[in-house]
Every structure is written in structure tokens, then in C-alpha cells.
């Protein structure tokens, strides 16, 4: 590496480090202080601006994704999510929608806009596993990870302004641009994984505060690993920015033992969750029938052998006389 490129790389590294927003780490481990402590990272993006940006992204998702229209399922998911939000450090409103997609996934946009795939609902055995996934996403929103990323990007853009006045032929120009194009994305990926770890850390506390068994969150990791074994690479894209699943399991188990006191009982599931899964299965079955052109049984009137009979005195065809048998059900081929 040339001297100019080394200096340029160090320059960009210093700017990146200087641009990393801190966090008011106030009683982060104190579950009893949830809702009063400060876990959000400092950012030059205001909450109002973050919500406005998130609304723009959400509008695009709503147009492009297949948003589930079932009011019963949507109401249930929203109720579970809002209960978790009330037992979290989130300072902005939470909006959650369900995407009709069989993949196991959930994600959060800036400003508290959240999406949950139907595949996550179907993969869960109990309500507490769904709560764990939602609580993780609330952890992202509460810590304002999106605002943190946008702050870094904004500062980096300003940091690159002086490059406009340096001739492109200068070695230092090429060195800075190489560092910017190669080093910055790697730094963002690294911190994104730290964000995921923090979201796990906070999410476990939120579901515990809401009365759920935090071990259910660890249990759902088993679902992810099973899916990966059944279909290698299927989860790689979804969890590319996450730490390895095995590491997340170990870290979560340690957190549960250290800062989450055992309770005599937890909310595991509800009969409503079973109803929701049954309703989802019905929708899936109906969708499969429709995709095959099978809409189920249809009514057809039985005709007489003599379809060429002459009109009767009442003006009807002989085959349509009042002596016909009642209609019968026949399945469409």
C-alpha cells in the first residue's frame, strides 16, 4: 500500500470513528427501569424526521409487497405488538403490518414502521415465539438504529465534500475513494451486527417485561436453524447482517441467566394464537386451490337423458320440468 493510500485510509477511518453516535447507556441492564431509561443512540436525525422518512419507505413497501388484508389476523398481531411496545423503551408510535409471504422474516423501517411475514406466524409453535421476533424488532426501533445509520451516512457525505477540490490525478484522491468504497460498507456491516446483538439484548428484556418466557426467543432460533438445514442458503439473505445463529443463542442464554430473574409463571400462548394459526392455514389452503384453478364444489342441475325434448305446455324444456331431481354437488375437475 502506498503512503498516500495509507494516509487516506487513516483519514476515512478517523472520520468514521468520529461519526459514530454514542448512546446514553442509562441502566441498560435494569429490567425494572424499562420505559424510563435511555437506550436510543444519539443522532442528528430528529424523531419527527425519522418518522417522516419511515413513512415514505412504508408507503413503498405497502405498494410493492402483498400486505395481508385479513382483519382478524392483523388485529391480533397488532395487539401483541402494542403490548410489547408498552413494555419497552420505545418513544415513538409503533405501526405493524403483516406481509403474506411464507418466508420466516420480520423487519423494521425508520420511525417505528414494522412488518412481519405470515411465514413467521406459521413457523412459531406458541405466541411467545412470535412475541420474541416482534420484541427484537422493537429493540431496533427503541435504540434508533436506523437514525444512527442515517447519521453516519450524512456525516460521511459531508466528510467527502473536500474531495471535490482535490484533482482526481492526485494519489490521495484515489486512496480516499478506495477507502470510502471498500472500507465504509464493511464498517456499516460490522456495526449492523452490533445493532442486531443489541436488538437481541433489548428484545429479550421487552418480552420478559410483557410476561413472556424469554427462552422462547432462543427456541425460535432452532426454527431458523431447522429451516436452514432443510433448505441450505434459504436464510442466508435474511440473516446476512446478523451474528451467527449459534452465537446469538449463547449470548441470549447468558443474558437470561444474568439479568432476567426467574418468574413462577410466564405467558406461553393463548387459545387465540391457535385460532390465528388455523385461520392462516385456511387462507393458505384456499390460495393453493385458487392457484390450481380449483375453487371447490359447485352446483350443477341434473339433466334428463332426452335433452332434445320439445317445450311443455308451461313453455319450459322437457328436461327442465318440475319432475327433475334436486341439484347435486359435483366437484369441478
Annotate each language-model stretch with its function.
Residues 1-10:
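Bacterial N-terminal signal peptides that target proteins for export
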Residues 293-307, 318-333:
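Short acidic, low-complexity intrinsically disordered linear motifs used
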Residues 9-18:
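Bacterial N-terminal signal peptides
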Residues 2, 24-32, 307-310, 326, ...:
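Long amphipathic alpha-helical segments used for membrane anchoring, targeting, substrate engagement
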Residues 313-317:
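Extended, charge-rich alpha-helical interface modules
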Residues 17-21, 91, 324, 329:
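Intrinsically disordered low-complexity regions specifically enriched for long asparagine
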Residues 20-284, 293:
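A Zn2+-metalloprotease active-site environment signal
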Amino acid at each position: 500500500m502506498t503512503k498516500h493510500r495509507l494516509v487516506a485510509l487513516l483519514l476515512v477511518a478517523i472520520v468514521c470513528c468520529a461519526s459514530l453516535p454514542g448512546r446514553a447507556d442509562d441502566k441498560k441492564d435494569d429490567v425494572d427501569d424499562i420505559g424510563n431509561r435511555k437506550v436510543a443512540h444519539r443522532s442528528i436525525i430528529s424523531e419527527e424526521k425519522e418518522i417522516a422518512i419511515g413513512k415514505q419507505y412504508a408507503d413503498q413497501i405497502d405498494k410493492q409487497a402483498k400486505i395481508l388484508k385479513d382483519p382478524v389476523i392483523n388485529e391480533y398481531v397488532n395487539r401483541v405488538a402494542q403490548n410489547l411496545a408498552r413494555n419497552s423503551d420505545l418513544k415513538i408510535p409503533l405501526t405493524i403490518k403483516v406481509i403474506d409471504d411464507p418466508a420466516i422474516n420480520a423487519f423494521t423501517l425508520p420511525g417505528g414502521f414494522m412488518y412481519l411475514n405470515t411465514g413467521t406466524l406459521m413457523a412459531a409453535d406458541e405466541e411467545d415465539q412470535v412475541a420474541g421476533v416482534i420484541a427484537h424488532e422493537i429493540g431496533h426501533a427503541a435504540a434508533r438504529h436506523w437514525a444512527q445509520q442515517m447519521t453516519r451516512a450524512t456525516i460521511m457525505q459531508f466528510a467527502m465534500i473536500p474531495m471535490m477540490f482535490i484533482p482526481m490525478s492526485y494519489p490521495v484522491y484515489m486512496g480516499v475513494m478506495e477507502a470510502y468504497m471498500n472500507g465504509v460498507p464493511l464498517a456499516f456491516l460490522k456495526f449492523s451486527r452490533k445493532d442486531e446483538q443489541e436488538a437481541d439484548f433489548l428484545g429479550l428484556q421487552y418480552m420478559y417485561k410483557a410476561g413472556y418466557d424469554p427462552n422462547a426467543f432462543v427456541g425460535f432460533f432452532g426454527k431458523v436453524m431447522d429451516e436452514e438445514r432443510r433448505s441450505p442458503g434459504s436464510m442466508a439473505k435474511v440473516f446476512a447482517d446478523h451474528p451467527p445463529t449459534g452465537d446469538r443463542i449463547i449470548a441470549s442464554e447468558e443474558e437470561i441467566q444474568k439479568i432476567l430473574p426467574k418468574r413462577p409463571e410466564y405467558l406461553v400462548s393463548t387459545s387465540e394464537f391457535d385460532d390465528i394459526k388455523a385461520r392462516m392455514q385456511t387462507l393458505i389452503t384456499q390460495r393453493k386451490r385458487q392457484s390450481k384453478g380449483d375453487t371447490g364444489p359447485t352446483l350443477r342441475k341434473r339433466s334428463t337423458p332426452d335433452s332434445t325434448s320439445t317445450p311443455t305446455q308451461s313453455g319450459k324444456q322437457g328436461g327442465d320440468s318440475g319432475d327433475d331431481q334436486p341439484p347435486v354437488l359435483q366437484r369441478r375437475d
